[in-house]
């Protein structure tokens, strides 16, 4: 079966059509700047394979429907298409940010599921409306085709109350559902399953610490194959230092800044989400630029690097204590998979925990799951490339199979 995976943003649509018999993407792409005077569509045929072909188009897209119609035209094009017509698509899987406590696993989209997505718009004001728009576009363009929602929060629903509750008046949880939800769950779940396969260990016996490090960063403590804690909270702002997000800070800083800098709640939110993290400390949010600046003696870039890796190291220690036994520390996503400097610095000095990195292995880049720890290490340190689209497609099939 071919599964179309859609990740709909407020002004974008990211998509991938996957042949699930071979687990191979037939095409992928991104529609950008929807609603602006001029939009852009980047379409790849046979992505990440030999003979990949990339097509770029610039044209206005008034709304998500227009953008998705153009995608369908490309997918089924007589010359460049990868399928003959829409009937060769068996199902559509949607990435959805927040499903709250009501949705603990991927679900077939119906009125109830759409109602839950709407109910959590106050906690996901940017993503949930956009995700819902993507679902409604798919329902319009592919009538009768099953749509499945795969939620970022699903994997973390196994956390115990002691991990997900905040020490605020309990009435706030009961009334407003203020709690830790966690995000990047699709990636953490995929990495957990791939690590079990790679190590040849039963999933229900696997204890690992997963580190999803990209422009957004999160970690998870996984015990017996299930998440028991994660760094992100009620929103993706909590936890690690990120590209533009501050991560953990003293909450009292927020009202202090609002008073001293005369900030509105929205302005304070923007400061913490879009002007902080690596960007706030050194003016750069791309780790590659930051490394170049470090090499040129930029002290703020060096400080940002040290702060970033220190936070990850600190959470490894915390999650080691939570798990008691750790089979592996696993790095994934853009920085986690490709940045040997970050991995080396994070693991430096953790020998007493059985965590160490072999410099030669750490320098290898091959796009495959691999050990970067020395032979005989008590804890395996691994790099495992993530594939959220494949995980969404697989979850979609699992729902349809029942």
From Swiss-Prot:
A molecular-function term among this protein's GO annotations: ATP binding
Binding site for Mg(2+): 7, 388
Positions with a binding annotation for ATP: 14, 212-216, 286-288, 334-338
Main localization category: cytoplasm
Amino acids binding substrate: 95
Active site: 152
Catalytically driven reaction(s): acetate + ATP = acetyl phosphate + ADP
Any one cellular-component term (Gene Ontology): cytoplasm
Record text on cofactor binding: Mg(2+). Can also accept Mn(2+).
E.C. no: 2.7.2.1
Swiss-Prot/TrEMBL cofactor(s): Mg(2+); Mn(2+)
Site (Transition state stabilizer): 184, 245
Domain of life where this protein originates: Bacteria
SUPFAM superfamilies to which the protein is assigned, alphabetical: Actin-like ATPase domain
InterPro entries, A to Z: Ac/propionate_kinase (IPR004372), Aliphatic_acid_kin_short-chain (IPR000890), Aliphatic_acid_kinase_CS (IPR023865), ATPase_NBD (IPR043129)
Keywords: ATP-binding, Cytoplasm, Kinase, Magnesium, Metal-binding, Nucleotide-binding, Transferase
Family: Belongs to the acetokinase family.
Function: Catalyzes the formation of acetyl phosphate from acetate and ATP. Can also catalyze the reverse reaction.
Subunit structure: Homodimer.
Protein name: Acetate kinase
